[in-house]
């Protein structure tokens, strides 16, 4: 059960890290305009942009997960 959850999280993180969409940051508000709360789409966009910077750590996590799948979760 825990192996399935770890595998699901790893695959989801990999999918987010390798997306090649042209995600642009939201334009800043001009002077005198009211600032509003970021929408859910803005939060998802920021999360996907931050995942791109952690690709090396995601690769190390993948190697660790492969090791765990062979040693701990293998039957």
From Swiss-Prot:
InterPro entries: SMIM7. Residues 75 are cytoplasmic. Residues 18-53 are extracellular. Residues 1-17 form the signal peptide. The keyword Transmembrane applies. GO terms for cellular component: membrane. It comes from the Eukaryota. The chain crosses the membrane at residues 54-74. Keywords: Membrane, Signal, Transmembrane, Transmembrane helix. Disulfide bonds: none annotated. It is found in: Membrane. It is a single-pass type I membrane protein. The keyword Flavoprotein does not apply. Belongs to the SMIM7 family. This is Small integral membrane protein 7. It comes from Homo sapiens. The lineage of its organism: Eukaryota, Metazoa, Chordata, Craniata, Vertebrata. The gene is SMIM7.
